[in-house]
């Protein structure tokens, strides 16, 4: 597949992806994940409590918060804390991250604990939510390993891996892992969350300029499968170091 992309990448190529573990010293799990120029810090914090609706049920909870630094984009944005209200986009993304990560955890095996994934965007160049999910999974694994090292778990609650990638139709061609110039000028934009068994966890797709057809959707999903397979390899390599 050949298409002229601003980055010069092939249509089925990811941006350079790096996952640096133990990026901060306080959280049970922390990573700096980069998808090209998109940089996200993901930390996993463990608390010995659960939300009210789960009390005394013997289950844990996985949740997430997401935010962007004021100058993570081309122009400065006011902090949401200063406005006193989270934007709808922020709420949507942090709920997505939480939903995605809950699918890879046996919450009964976790016990009555909450693991919160805080995903903070240092620099945005497209794909911040997919980078956040991919990095947050690694931070979650490190948090679980920390609990195991403390002797606080009878067995690992992890039941699979999760990663996410964007795909889209840019200049008439399906492409993988859109950066900002592509994302802002594409015909179709889609975020795909998958597990390492080939299952789809969430699909978020929108026709930005013109409708897409079933055949194009199939090509986008095939690209997403290829991309997440590469991301699972990167996650495994990071966790083996």
UniProtKB/Swiss-Prot annotation:
Enzyme class, broadest EC rank: transferase
Sites where the protein binds phosphate: 89, 127-129
GO molecular function, one term: tRNA binding
Catalytic activity of the protein: tRNA(n+1) + phosphate = tRNA(n) + a ribonucleoside 5'-diphosphate
Family the entry assigns: Belongs to the RNase PH family.
Xref: NCBIfam families: RNasePH
Protein name per its UniProtKB record: Ribonuclease PH
Classification lineage: Bacteria, Pseudomonadati, Pseudomonadota, Gammaproteobacteria, Lysobacterales
């Amino acid at each position: 597949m050949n298409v002229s992309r601003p980055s010069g990448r092939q249509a089925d190529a990811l941006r350079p992806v790096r996952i640096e573990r133990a990026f901060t010293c306080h959280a049970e799990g922390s990573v700096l994940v980069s998808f090209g120029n998109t940089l996200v810090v993901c930390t996993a914090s463990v608390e010995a409590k659960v939300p009210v609706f789960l009390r005394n049920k013997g289950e844990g909870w996985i949740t997430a918060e997401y935010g962007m630094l004021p100058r993570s984009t081309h122009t400065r944005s006011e902090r949401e804390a200063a406005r006193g209200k989270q934007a709808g986009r922020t709420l949507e993304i942090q709920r997505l991250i939480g939903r995605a990560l809950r699918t890879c955890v046996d919450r009964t095996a976790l016990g009555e604990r909450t693991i919160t994934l805080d995903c903070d965007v240092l620099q945005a160049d497209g794909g911040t939510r997919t980078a956040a999910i991919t990095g947050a999974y690694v931070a979650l694994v490190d948090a679980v390993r920390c609990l195991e090292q403390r002797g606080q778990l009878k067995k690992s609650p992890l039941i699979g891996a999760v990663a996410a990638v964007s795909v889209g139709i840019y200049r008439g061609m399906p492409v993988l892992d859109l950066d900002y110039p592509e994302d802002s000028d594409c015909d179709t934009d889609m975020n795909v969350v998958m597990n390492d068994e080939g299952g789809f966890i969430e699909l978020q797709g929108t026709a930005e300029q013109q409708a897409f057809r079933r055949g194009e959707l199939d090509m986008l999903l095939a690209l997403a499968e290829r991309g997440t397979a590469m991301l699972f390899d990167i996650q495994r390599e990071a966790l083996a170091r």
